[in-house]
Amino acid sequence: MTNVYSFDGILVFGLLFICTCAYLKKVPRLNSWLLSEKKGVWGVFYKAAVIGTRLHVVVAASCLCMAFYLIFLK
C-alpha cells in the first residue's frame, strides 16, 4: 500500500491517471464528453491523455518499473 503523500504515491497516482486518461481517449462516448475541453480544469484530462498516447512506450516502461519497485523493493 502506498501513501499518497509520499513521492512514491505521487508517482503511482500520476502514472495511473495518465494510463486511465489514455484509455478513456479510446472510448468514443467518454472521449467526446470528458476530453473535449482542452483548456482549464478539464484540460488536465486531455493533456494526460495526450501524454499517454504519444509516450505510450515510456509510460508502459515506467509502470513496469514502478510495479517492480513496489512489489519487490518496498
Curated annotation (Swiss-Prot):
Topology feature Cytoplasmic, residues: 74
Residues in the signal sequence: 1-22
Function as written in the Swiss-Prot or TrEMBL entry: Involved in the early part of the secretory pathway.
Protein name: Protein kish-B
Domain of life assignment: Eukaryota
Transmembrane segments annotated in the record for this chain: 53-73
Family from the record: Belongs to the KISH family.
InterPro entries, A to Z: Kish-B, Ksh1
GO cellular component terms, semicolon-separated: Golgi membrane
